[in-house]
């Protein structure tokens, strides 16, 4: 690894905007972005994927490798990524810093506590929860209805025992007993707010708008009513600054914020993306899960808020994912199966068609695994060419930037100045926005709203939230809301079970299917593979 000062020098960053965290990590003062406003923006490359298998398809690895490969062919590039969540790192998924020869460094530190941003978000979130219950205990001047408190508590850990709890037991000295729950920190609205805020003023305004409860008159109670947004911002004072690290080949990487891609928008901070676009020719960023979730939200929501638009999209696919969506069993996924591959290719086709609806040039990155056969690779390449889409076999995991040269060249040939196309208008009612997304992206035949969802729609209209963008929270395991429907389901009924407003983040969340905001640990969590020796060397994290 290079000292972080050398990485900063590549970007022209002076010491007065750099806050080092040891030798290899630094934060960049978020106010530095304003000094760059007269610079021309570089190209923005959005990396997304087909519907993933449980193991993931290498989207982060591809993003890192593509950025390194762009630098290799003489194009100045920065990769921007979300911060890993500690819970999944210790649980089933493992770390989120790429893999093989395409990683961000120092991987262990990034995957674990990093610069403390997750802790800051959790602290701000839980401060609000504590102040809310304290207000109720000490007279409840705002007349908060304890049966209509929406704000949960948070922890950056997978712990299913905390999904449903009772607080305030043990007598009046401990407050009022009521049901509560914990969510993982990445699902906190504070995380979404931090990722969307462009400066401290914006951050405090967004925090103040967060809805925490209803009072006994059925009126909304916000953070600003409790007067705690200033203290929450104090706890987030350093977390608003993007984190600078490097890849395995010394390419600069900005890693900042980590909102979930189902309950929120699933990409790194707007500050990091805009800063990278000012400092490089090509910014490579990724959106969580498949293109039906992350990419749609990036374009319909994040791009609108940030004032930018991708110049191209990279659709990451793997032979194993396509075989899985063609009916192959995960136990036999590494065996050649052209029939399953042919059937599963329909999943790639749907995601490609969806991306093209946004007027985006698309490059398919076929992330090669050692078990892929030549026949399987050739089939995917041939079918992509039939669809008129550029395709490049990517081997950045095994070969680093050398394995992504073909992909980098395809991306530079594909990029163009794109006229933004959004699927819905902001003045469309929420119900119509959901129907557009369900039919255009998820390929549903019709949309059904539960009675709970219908009541939520009335609340949304009554309180003036109908013109907010929509974030659909559904399973990432299928294009539909049903995780058992692999491949390219269509014509089904898309069921909306409930809706709620994230007023600070500025969107309405539509829930479809079972959405769990506090993951649990598997039978054998990744934590069992971790250890540290007497010299402080960590094993088993990434």
From Swiss-Prot:
GO BP, sorted A to Z: tetrahydrofolate interconversion
Pathway: One-carbon metabolism; tetrahydrofolate interconversion
EC code(s) of this entry: 6.3.4.3
Enzymatic class: ligase
Signal sequence annotation: none
Catalyzed reaction equations: (6S)-5,6,7,8-tetrahydrofolate + formate + ATP = (6R)-10-formyltetrahydrofolate + ADP + phosphate
Gene3D superfamilies: Domain 2, N(10)-formyltetrahydrofolate synthetase (3.30.1510.10), Formyltetrahydrofolate synthetase, domain 3 (3.10.410.10), P-loop containing nucleotide triphosphate hydrolases (3.40.50.300)
Residues binding ATP: 53-60
This protein's UniProt keywords: ATP-binding, Ligase, Nucleotide-binding, One-carbon metabolism
Residue stretches spanning the membrane: none
UniProt entry tagged with the keyword Lyase: no
An example Gene Ontology molecular-function term: ATP binding
Family of this protein: Belongs to the formate--tetrahydrofolate ligase family.
Protein name, entry field: Formate--tetrahydrofolate ligase
Source organism of the structure: Thermotoga petrophila (strain ATCC BAA-488 / DSM 13995 / JCM 10881 / RKU-1)
Gene designation per UniProt: fhs
């Amino acid at each position: 690894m290079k000292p972080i000062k050398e990485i900063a020098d590549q970007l022209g960053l002076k010491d007065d905007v750099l806050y080092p965290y040891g030798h290899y990590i630094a934060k960049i003062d978020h106010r530095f972005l304003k000094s760059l406003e007269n610079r021309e923006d570089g190209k923005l490359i959005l990396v997304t994927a087909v519907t993933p298998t449980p193991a993931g398809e290498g989207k982060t690895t591809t993003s890192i490798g593509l950025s390194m490969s762009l630098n290799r062919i003489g194009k100045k590039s920065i990769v921007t990524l979300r911060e890993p969540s500690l819970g999944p790192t210790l649980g089933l998924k493992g770390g989120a810093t790429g893999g093989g020869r395409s990683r961000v460094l120092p991987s262990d530190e990034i995957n674990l506590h990093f610069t403390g941003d997750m802790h800051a978000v959790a602290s701000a979130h839980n401060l609000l929860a504590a102040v809310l219950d304290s207000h109720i205990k000490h007279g409840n001047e705002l007349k908060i209805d304890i049966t209509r408190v929406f704000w949960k508590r948070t922890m950056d850990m997978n712990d299913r025992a905390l999904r449903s709890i009772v607080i305030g037991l043990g007598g009046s000295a401990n407050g009022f007993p009521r049901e509560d729950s914990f969510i993982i920190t990445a699902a906190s609205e504070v995380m979404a707010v931090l990722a969307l805020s462009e400066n401290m003023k914006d951050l405090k305004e967004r925090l103040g708008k967060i809805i925490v409860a209803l009072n006994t008159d059925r009126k909304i109670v916000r953070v600003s009513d409790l007067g705690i947004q200033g203290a929450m911002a104090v706890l987030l004072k350093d977390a608003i600054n993007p984190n600078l690290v490097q890849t395995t080949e010394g390419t600069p990487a900005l890693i900042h914020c980590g909102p979930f891609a189902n309950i929120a928008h699933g990409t790194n901070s707007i500050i990091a993306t805009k800063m990278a676009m000012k400092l490089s020719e090509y910014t490579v960023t990724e959106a969580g899960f498949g293109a039906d979730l992350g990419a749609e939200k990036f374009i319909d929501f994040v791009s609108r808020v940030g004032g930018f638009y991708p110049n191209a999209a990279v659709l990451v696919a793997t032979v194993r994912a396509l075989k899985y969506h063609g009916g192959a069993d995960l136990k036999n996924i590494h065996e050649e199966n052209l029939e399953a591959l042919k059937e599963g290719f329909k999943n790639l086709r749907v995601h490609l068609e969806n991306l093209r609806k946004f007027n985006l040039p698309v490059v398919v990155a076929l992330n090669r695994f050692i078990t892929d056969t030549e026949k399987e690779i050739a089939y995917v390449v041939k079918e992509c060419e039939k669809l008129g889409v550029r395709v490049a076999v990517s081997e950045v995991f095994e070969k680093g930037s050398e394995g992504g040269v073909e992909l980098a060249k395809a991306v530079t040939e594909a990029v163009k100045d794109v006229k933004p196309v959004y699927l819905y208008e902001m003045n469309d009612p929420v119900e119509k926005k959901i129907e557009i997304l369900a039919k255009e992206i998820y390929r549903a035949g019709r949309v059904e709203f539960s009675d709970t969802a219908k009541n939520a729609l009335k609340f949304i209209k009554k309180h003036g939230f109908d013109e907010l963008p929509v974030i659909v929270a559904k399973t990432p395991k299928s294009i539909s809301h049903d995780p058992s429907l692999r491949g390219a389901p269509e014509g089904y009924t898309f069921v909306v079970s409930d809706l709620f407003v994230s007023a600070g983040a500025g969107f309405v969340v539509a829930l479809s299917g079972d959405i769990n905001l506090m993951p649990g640990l598997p039978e054998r969590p990744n934590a069992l593979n971790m250890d540290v020796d007497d010299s402080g060397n960590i094993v088993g994290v990434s």
